[in-house]
Amino acid sequence: MWKKWLGAIVATVLLSTAAGAQELTVMTSGGFTAAFERLAPQYTKQTGVKVTTLLGPSMGETPQAIPNRLARGEHADVVIMVGSALQTLIDAGVVDPASRVELADSRIGMVVRSGASKPKIDSVEHFRQTLLHADSVAYSDSASGVYIEATLFKQLQIQGPMMAKSKKIPRIPVGTVVADGSYQLGFQQVAELLPVAGVEFVGKIPEQLQSITRYAAGVPVNAQHPDAARRLLTYLQSGEAQAVARVTGLDPVSP
């Protein structure tokens, strides 16, 4: 009889623990979105914890940007974003510094519209010539686009001609404006380009020109379920999660 009572007590404790965090709200930015959209259902299946995902860039002036969402009082248990932007939130006292975990690195890639010829970008000079001969170029308003506009063009000494035919695209995936024919070339983090229909992935830009973006995650200081949030972060560092991240175009980092 006592074993039945003990089993009932343990079951009650486990159910109570799960009930304390049956739903987590996660804000994630573009580069990790494809991976997280695969991982969240797996985590729910394994733990019973429902995950609500809110999307937004790591920075920028759009209302959907994660810092802006948090600033106006939107709730999140976990934020997944560009590491430097996460550090800004940590320094501002918005995210618990002890909760930060490193997840993956992301590199910049290029797409063209499906059916279009793929220009050469296998060397710095080929890449430079491809840019100069392009009719139009689009890139994101997040970390990769900021780098392209402020650093890459200048490094290649083509800032003048490129700025005249380039556009920073807010809110939506860059691939979508290449797919509809609005722009000839599109640049964004690889993980954000691969899921877009109607484009062909040409490849990563030359490694000598890369800007590697680190993705990290943390728990806001006002999270409603901080303990459950940390368990999710542990899962995101697991081998299972790293394998999914790799498939979606990211380069996982070891915990």
Predicted segments, located by residue:
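N-terminal secretory signal peptides that target proteins for export/translocation
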Residues: 1-2
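Phosphate-/polyanion-interacting regions in eukaryotic proteins
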Residues: 80
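Exported/periplasmic ABC-transporter solute-binding proteins
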Residues: 22-64, 71-75, 84-92, 96-97, ...
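Bacterial N-terminal signal peptides
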Residues: 5-17
